[in-house]
Amino acid sequence: MVYTVGVADLKISGESSDLLITYALGSCLGITVYDFKLKRAGLLHCMLPDSSIDKDKAAGNPFLYVDSGMKVLLDDFLRKGSRKNDLIIRVAGGSSSKLNEEEDFFKIGRRNFVSLRQYLWNEGLMLKAYDVGGYGSRTVTMAVESGKMLIKSQGSLKQL
């Protein structure tokens, strides 16, 4: 089955035939977590770096934010028997909202990526691969069976 992950959303699957997909990642991040031993995959589409900006919104939807969304995602994997050493984490998105990145006043895409790296560092985890920054949107597809992450951006397709 194909599951579409919306903005500020999370999907996790252990069904080998499933695909997880999210569209139109601009400054948002599409973060995939894959347990290669248990064959489980998760895809988080988050918008903003830090849930301390609005704790009420984060309580209502933790997937809005990198930190609170990652906490829910990782907690689910660990609760279901994953070990941190078995997790493969990749990310795409984090684009600038301006062609000239220096004109992007808020730099949300960059801040999202920094927030993710800080969160992972604090959890003792590392990114395996990333495709972030630049200008333009990305679509991310995650195959549960293989753990492959495909990124479509501006007409090209690549695997992370």
Label every model-predicted segment:
Residues 5-6, 21, 43, 127-131, ...:
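General beta-strand structural signal in soluble alpha/beta enzymes
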Residues 11, 47-52, 93-97, 133-135:
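Acidic, glycine-rich active-site loops and adjacent beta-strand->loop/helix elements
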Residues 85-93:
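Short glycine-rich phosphate-binding loop at a beta-alpha junction
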